Amino acid sequence: MKYTILQLDDHNPDVVKGRKLFEPWNILNKYSKFDISQYKKVYEGEIQEEKNLLRTLESIFEKFNLRHPSDFHGHSLSVSDVVVLDGIGYYCDSYDWINTETGKEI
């Protein structure tokens, strides 16, 4: 299964000024709104699909916190990062993942 990792562009003045880096979903949406255009692609890869979506996302999270690929140049996967699977973005929140299209927890 192909995936893409997106991280907020910390050189974008709107991101820095809005203090959006590492914000939980509910705080981000309280003061502003999720905007995919403020993200940059930092990695694309493939992973074996797990038995469910949550497990697949957790496998990617683990990989980018414990075993970074040598060609990955972003920060460890953290709150406010987005993993895209099958064209749908999943926001890494404090304790779970949020579907960026529906705003619902996975």
Protein language model annotation of sequence segments:
Residues M1-Y43:
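N-terminal disorder-to-order initiation segments that are Gly/Lys/Arg-biased
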Residues I5, V15-V16, I27, I36, ...:
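Weak global preference for isoleucine
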Residues I27-V84:
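Short, conserved turn/kink motifs that form compact alpha/beta structural patches or helix kinks used as
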Residues H73-I106:
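Short, compact, well-ordered microdomains
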